[in-house]
Amino acid sequence: MSIKAFIFDLDGVLTDTSDYHYRAWKRLADELGIPFDRQRNEALRGVSRRRSLELLLDGRPATEAQMEEWMERKNRYYVESLEGLTPDDLLPGALDLLREIRRAGLKVGIASASKNTRTVLDHLNLWPLADAVSDGYSVERTKPAPDLFLHLSLIHI
């Protein structure tokens, strides 16, 4: 069987948006009067937005309505901060590798648990190099479940 496609995770493989997330969580924490620094932020990496907020609150009481509002606010801050994201924020070698794969006639799939994947791809100008995208809207279960990758295989990537 020959290789027909490559599937890439977005964050940490093609780009690194961790600082954008940190600044959004920091802004929310400051508004809520909760101490928050980069060391505390490390516990939020790779964790869902809800679980991240629970870790940020560290046992402080909150209603479901507050939780929803704070998660939405953090995401809004994050998306606003992405306005500064450009193709220069691709990790070294990522663009060259994607172009080489396409020149070889192979397909490229991008899999990310984020529901902001499409916004990130817009700012990185990666749409011309992606044959298919699977994101947090594409599947019910995201990582560590394999559904993002299985979704791409189902659409023949």
Segment roles from a protein language model:
Residues 2-42:
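Active-site neighborhood of HAD-like aspartate-dependent phosphohydrolases
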Residues 155-157:
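Conserved small/polar residues in nucleotide/adenosyl-binding loops
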Residues 112-114:
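Conserved phosphate-coupling serine/threonine residues in phosphotransfer and NTP-handling enzymes
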Residues 46-81, 95, 99-100:
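A metal-dependent, Asp-based hydrolase signature
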Residues 143-153:
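Short loop-to-alpha-helix "cap/lid" segments that border enzyme active sites
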Residues 80-110:
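Short, acidic loop-to-helix structural element flanking the phosphoryl-transfer center
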Residues 40-45, 128-142:
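A short, structured active-site edge motif that brings together acidic residues
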